[in-house]
């Protein structure tokens, strides 16, 4: 039984997280033949200020990105 952990920035909707869980489950079913009911997915939400990219907090990087 696979257990998949996804770390991602916090702030996504309940619906978006449900889509992530379904997509991962479907991918394992289609690619490895694992029954959907055997797959577990955990989403761990991390605030951007606790996430570093290239030595800089993601919240700082986002603040300096141009917005469309």
Which sequence ranges carry the predicted segments?
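A domain-level signal for the structural core that forms small-molecule/cofactor-binding pockets
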Residues: 2-68
């Amino acid at each position: 039984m696979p257990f998949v952990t996804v770390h991602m920035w916090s702030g996504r909707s309940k619906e978006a997280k449900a889509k992530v869980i379904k997509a991962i489950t479907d991918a394992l079913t289609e690619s490895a033949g694992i029954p959907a009911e055997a797959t577990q997915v955990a989403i761990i939400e991390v605030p951007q200020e606790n996430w570093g990219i290239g030595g800089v907090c993601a919240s700082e990087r986002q603040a300096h990105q141009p917005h469309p």
